[in-house]
Amino acid sequence: MELKDQLMQQIDRERLPQHIAIIMDGNGRWAKERGKQRLFGHQSAIQSVREVSEASAEIGVKYLTLYAFSTENWNRPLAEVSGLMSLLATTITKEVSTMNKNSIKLNAIGDLKSLPEANYKQLMQAIADTSHNTRMTLTLALSYSGRWDLTQATRRMAEDVAQGKLQPDAVNDTLISSYLSTAGMPDPELLIRTSGEERISNFLLWQLAYSELYFTPKYWPDFRKADLYEAILNYQHRERRFGKTSEQVTKK
C-alpha cells in the first residue's frame, strides 16, 4: 500500500477541517534549484493544485482556498506576471471538465477587475460552468490581500452607514465577516504554507484568527496528496481551545 493510502486511512473523517487554506510558496526557488526560469516552477505547480484539489474533495473537505496571486505580486517582473496570467488563462479553461467530473465548484476572491480583461472573462466563464457542483468549493485568491479585503469591507460598510442602510451599533464580528470576500464560507480551520517560510503574508488576515497553522519545508511543486494528508493528521492531533483552558475543552 502506498504511503498516501496509509495516511488517508488514518484520517478521522468526523474531524476533518471544513475549510483548508493554502499559501502555495516556493515555485520560484524550486525552479531556480533546477536551473530553470521561475515560470517553469509555476507551470510545474499545476499538478500540485490538481492533486490537492482532488484529494480534498475525495476525503470530504468542503472548502479549499488557494493563494494564487497577491496584490503585491503585481510588482514582480513584467515577464513573470504576463507568464502567470497566460498560465492562469490556459489552466482554468483546461481544468473545467476535471472540476465538473469531481463536482468541484470554482470560486474566486480578490480585486478581480484588476486582472487583464481576457483573464477576467475566462475566470467568470469557468465559475459559471462549474456553479452547479456541490462536492467542494475551490476558491482562487487572485489579486488578493487581507488588507485589501478589510479595506473593501470597511468602505462598503461606511457607504451603507452613510446611506442609512446600516446602523453603526449593528457592527459586530458576524457583520464584518459578511462584508468580506469570503462571506458565506466558514473561516479556515487549517492553513498550510509550503517552502519553509513561517508567516501568513497578508492572506485572510481576519479569517485566520483561530486557524491552526501548518508549515512544511517542501516546495509547492513537490506537494502531493500524502503531504496534504500529513497536514490534516497533524491538525487532528491538535487541541483547538478558542481562548478556553485545556480542562474546559476536555470537559466539553
What annotation goes with each model-predicted range?
Residues M1-K252:
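Flexible, compositionally biased loop and terminal segments
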